[in-house]
Amino acid sequence: MGLSWALLPFLLLAFRAELLALQPALGSQPPSASSSHSMGSSRDFVSNVSSSQHPQPPGSEASAGIPDSNRFPQGLNSSHVPGLFRTNVSAEEQYLSPDVTSSETPPSRVSLDGLDSQDPDKDSGLPFLVKTPASQISVQTPDTKVPTKASGSKLSLEHHNLEPGSKISSEIYQAASFPQQVGGPLAVLVGTTIRLPLTPVPSSSPPAPLVVWRRGSKVLAAGGLGSQAPLISLDPMHQARLRFDQIRGGLELTSARLDDAGVYTVEVIRGGVSQQIREFVVGVFEPLPQLSVQPRAPETEEGAAELRLSCVGWNPGSGKLSWSRDGRALGTSDPEGAEPPRIRTERDQLLISRPVRSDHARYTCQVRSPFGHTEAAADVSVFYGPDAPVIRVSSDRDASPALYVTAGSNVTLHCSAPSRPPADIAWSLADPTEAAVPAGPRLLLPAVGPGHGGAYACIAANPRTGHRRRSVFNLTVADLPPGAPQCSVEGGPVDRSLRFRCSWPGGVPAASLQFQGLPEGVRAGPVPSTLLVTVPARPELSGVAVTCLARHLVATRTCTIIPEAPQEVLLQPIVEETQPGDVVVALEVTGCPPPSRASWARQGRPLAPGGGGRLQLSQDGRKLLINNFSLDWDLGNYSVLCSSALGAGGNQITLTGPSISSWRLQRAQEAAVLTWDVERGTLLTGFHIQAWTDSSEVDRVTMSRDWVSLLILGPQERSAIVPLPPRNPGTWAFRILPILGSLPGTPSQSRVYQAGSDLSPGAIAGIVLGSLLGLALLAGLLILCICCLRRYPGRASVKKQHSLTLAPVLTPPAKKIQSLTPVQTPRPLPIKTKMQSPHPAKAQQVISPSPTLCPGGSPWTVRAATQV
């Protein structure tokens, strides 16, 4: 029997009993149109049930429709359906009045809201239309024709007799509203029982409720509540596993299977009107599986086509599958039509296209269900590299070792090459003969030298993939050239050009040389080590500074040369005593700057440079050396000529033996001062100050009156101070003996030093003669003046008006104590230089008297003081 045939008798009986039970209440209680009907569904629920015509009074027609058993309600809402029922719920009973304000109500019919319980006769003849949103049941009164038609079963119900003129009050006893789904989806395991309770349990008071259970659009069970209520229908396909509770209205489905999952709906119907609809979302899951990722140790290379990981043990019924990498969830595949991502999922597999090194991670597949979760993981190894090796250099001395390292520093080379697994590092040195090359990322080069410079190759090899990469680093070891750059300039052929030369040889790498200051248009470098530039000779080049700029990795040095014409050329003799008795004489020319060349001559005969023998010229030609000098052979005239493209000049000198050209003896307090001169060209190595005396108090002088050397002075000395005994010094004789090596020269003339206050007879005679001569001259002058005055008396008076006035001459007082001693010399001797003595003495004043006539005619001795 179909569902329509099963529901038809129960529906008719329930509707008839409801009408009979509500008839007395309609006359005593007015219906209310303000109550709401509790219903909801996620699907549309529409079915029409038509019943066959029954004999009814005229104008009385009732039609009812029941839901289609093959359609599942989804989005049912009372606000969307015209002609909805509104209920007024009180503590005792509920009243239902139809709302016929919808446009679907024919205008010839009167809605249930227009019924008046106080005038039953008037209302009994009006049509009564009732439509529910769920069942679309139409009831017309007072006609009792109730056509009932269930769609799908094509069944026409038999007519039922209703009393004509009876007042019908559609009273529906419904329970309190309940939500569509309580507690979220229902999850069960395969093989367990699905229990769907109906909460709250509908009241079993008449009219008896009808409970219909569906899964989707398929009816699973339908029946009334109560122990005496019949069970109308059970789905034949699930009849063996279905249990319908007719007391509480619940449903049980034993031995749950995966296909039992879905949306279950329960509908409570009273008197042909759907009152309650509730949905249950049921999920059926298999127990959580034991998962594993295959392959267990996946390996691939960077740039491979793809890598697939499978989550073994998962099936769709056990739960939702997800993948993660290092704990971060991986996104799902892109929508259809978009470019597929590089990492995507396909069923139970994770596909990694074109793996890269960042894909090296731990991948986890996880299955999650309401009953828990399980997971499995695998470590994916992505081999790559080696990349191009990178060589870094460090030095304990240098700030920028990548450019160069200085000789003697300790250098370390570091090589790194990103690779998985780590690459094996090997070195290839610049020196191919080096056999013991250590393996590893660090290469130590202690105390590097120029031989360590060159190319160093780092070779990185991946031991897993076999790939190899190589990089080369050029190590520069810088060694500064010794000394400093040397600059020179010399004349070209026929003195028409100047050749500038700069040299700084040695060093690693070679220094770069360049001239600065040369005329424009002259190519002046840079060149390594040695630079030679020829410039046409021009007068304006004289005095111009030309600088050579020498650049090296370690330092930058300069040298400057100024080409000049010869000026004030002068020869100077230089005497050196290399060994006792062995003398070397040199002639050095000054005022002969580069680019001048010096040409030497002796006694008018030119000297060839580099001729050998005892006469030798220096490398620059500006010094003439005379080895093993001999007074018999090497004395004479020497000359030099300096010439260049800028001018010429010369000088000559006559070399003589050791001698004194002139000397002086002066008195001082308790000392004798000697000064002397020598001719230019005199060769000597020192002076001996010699003396003898007739006083026996001097221990250094013998009674035989031999000359004794009191002082020995150097060749540059030109004065000497000889201290004398303070008491009774006596008479002294002094002379100067020049020395050349071990050979004595010609001594000077001797001079006598007379100590004490008594004048010698000669001095007294001189003073007397001088005084007489002075008086005679003064008398003659007076006589001459008298004669002139007598001869020219007028002019004398005029002259008297202009008397002669002489300014007084002031002599500054002496700073030291002076002594007066008469000597035979008429004037003092000037002192030029100081004399050094083995016994140091302080500088003293030398005072020599000078005879002068006093106003009275007698001579005075005037002191002449000289500070020594």
Curated annotation (Swiss-Prot):
CDD domains in the record: Ig
Major localization class: membrane
Keywords: Disulfide bond, Glycoprotein, Immunoglobulin domain, Membrane, Repeat, Signal, Transmembrane, Transmembrane helix
Organism name: Mus musculus (Mouse)
Record-linked SMART domains: IG, IGc2
Domain of life where this protein originates: Eukaryota
Compartments, as annotated in UniProt: Membrane
Pfam families named among the record's database cross-references: Ig_2 (PF13895)
Alphabetical list of InterPro entries matching this protein: CEA_cell_adhesion, Ig-like_dom, Ig-like_dom_sf, Ig-like_fold, Ig_sub, Ig_sub2
Chain ranges passing through the membrane: 764-784
Region (Disordered): 26-82, 96-154, 323-342
Composition-biased stretches (Low complexity): 26-52
Domain Ig-like C2-type: start-end pairs: 289-381, 389-474
Keyword Transmembrane helix in record: yes
Gene3D superfamilies in the cross-refs: Immunoglobulins
Residue intervals on the Cytoplasmic side: 785-868
Extracellular membrane side: 28-763
Stretch forming the signal peptide: 1-27
Topology in the lipid bilayer: Single-pass type I membrane protein
S-S bonds: 311-365, 415-458
The protein's name in its UniProt record: V-set and immunoglobulin domain-containing protein 10-like
Ranges of biased composition (kind: Polar residues): 71-80, 99-108, 133-143
One cellular component (GO) term of this entry: nucleoplasm
